[in-house]
Amino acid sequence: MKRIVILMLALVMVIGLASCGNTNVMTMGTGGTQGTYYGYGGILGNQIKNSAGITVNVVSTDGSKANILGIDAGNYQLATVQSDVMAYAAAGERSFEKEGALDSFRVIGGLYAEAVQLVTMDPSIKSVADLAGKKVSIGAAGSGVYFNAIDILAAAGLTENDIVPQYQSFGDSADALKDKKIDAAFIVAGAPTPAIQELCIAASAYLVPIDGAIADKLMQDSPYYTTYKIPANTYNGQAEDVTTVTVKATLIVSTSASEEAVYNITKAIFDNVDSIKAAHAKGAELSLENATSGMTAPFHKGAAKYFAEKNITVESK
């Protein structure tokens, strides 16, 4: 009888610990291996492990929506997402219309600008308007890239029906461009993006500007867009700056994560900006200001605690 009681108590302790989750090991959803999320996520994971003692298993995923759903399902505890997709999830609209509003994630901080990059090798495509009648990859249906492409087409007076849409991932878009199966592709990622770098070197691809009246209308209709310049020589053969629009790559965390763990993660990242800058080009955009501005969902209380120590107040929940 005594032995049974001891076993039952042990079982209760195990179940209790499992329900709290293992805060020393977390899984981070990122993106495709040819995108910026995956490589940058690896850098963040290493920094978190070295400074906070939390092991982060970085996994390749289908991107922002998959990452948010993964957190909601309990498969991931951390994830990188586009700020606009995060807004859709919080409101239960666009790509999250079917799922409804989700409240299972919180913001840790903004990371860097995710440029909307319109890539082509077709010399007749000089503007968004020139996409009419062309085969264009606009990302997976319902993805963040898809809605970015739809927004930009609309700002140029076009609809999905005015092009020959192809619903492809970063890697598939790059392969299709290289094989001349499509005429252009929308790729949303931090520049330089590995997939685009390869295209510019191997196939003389180039970027089409998204600027002027198109950018103005886009920002008027959707305030999470801002203008952004991709500096000259970011890609092979790019002689001049290219103006486009951007959303923001954001690190989010599950609401199940403790305040202490999230505080330590936030501190591990933003107390070590120089180390992250040295490890990845997009680290140059990492700052307290960038981390706390333009967010479209509430911060985790652990992150808010860290930023409060830096005299920055953010909305938390």
List the model feature ranges, each with a label.
Residues 1-8:
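Positively charged n-region of N-terminal signal peptides that target proteins for export
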Residues 40, 168, 172, 179, ...:
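An extracytoplasmic/periplasmic, membrane-proximal ligand-sensing/linker region
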Residues 42-46, 59-98, 118-126, 171-176, ...:
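Pocket-flanking alpha-helical
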Residues 135-151, 224-295:
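Ligand-binding clefts/hinges and TM-proximal coupling segments of bilobed small-molecule sensing domains
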